[in-house]
A protein has these predicted regions:
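Canonical P-loop GTPase G-domain recognition
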Residues: 123-149
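Adenylate-forming
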Residues: 21, 150-151
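Short, hinge-like loop/turn segments at secondary-structure boundaries
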Residues: 74, 108, 133-137
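Conserved Switch II/interswitch segment of TRAFAC-class P-loop GTPases
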Residues: 84-102, 116-128
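Switch II of P-loop NTPase G domains
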Residues: 38-43, 61-84, 94-107
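A short helix->loop->beta-strand "cap" motif at the edges of active sites that frequently abuts
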Residues: 111-114
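Conserved G1/Walker A P-loop phosphate-binding module
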Residues: 1-67, 72
Length: 151
């Protein structure tokens, strides 16, 4: 049987749950999880191995509008992760309702990388708000996403 592998970038705003998701997917505490913003400053790679496949997850810094050199470097890690990806997972924090900025959305659409949208923290909002968010995200990304799930 042929062994398959793929690269998955996890993106989203700070504290959206990206590192928690990566830790859960690889089955160990690889990325630091902290309430402090910008705990993840570099790309952190986590690998999930199976008998027939391997998935390399890239936990990226939270998406921000960079104000100084370190933040610009952190955003370059996010941008470079798109190029290497077979799939981008966008973790959307439903408790803040902040959607990704136009520049990043435009890059995703331009690269035509498949997009999986994960709506996180739905336990903090009501069902109507979940439905409104799903409708808004579907409208924003039209045909560019593979699937939209909530956790």
């Amino acid at each position: 049987m042929k062994h398959k592998s793929g690269f998955v970038s996890i993106i989203g705003y700070p504290n959206a749950g990206k590192s928690t998701l990566v830790n859960a997917l690889v089955g160990e505490k690889l990325s630091i999880v902290n309430a402090k913003v910008q705990t993840t400053r570099d790309r952190i790679l986590g690998i999930y191995n199976s008998e027939n496949y391997q998935i390399v997850f890239s936990d990226t810094p939270g998406i921000i509008d960079p104000k100084y050199k370190l933040q610009k470097k952190m955003m370059s890690y996010v941008m470079s992760s798109f190029v290497d990806s077979d799939l981008v997972v966008y973790v959307f924090d439903s408790s803040t309702n902040k959607n990704i900025v136009g520049k990043i959305k435009d890059i995703l659409l331009e690269l035509k990388v498949p997009l999986l949208i994960v709506i996180n923290k739905i336990d903090l909002i009501n069902q109507q708000k979940v439905e409104d968010i799903m409708k808004s995200l579907k409208s924003d990304f039209l045909d560019s996403y593979l699937s939209l799930i909530h956790i």
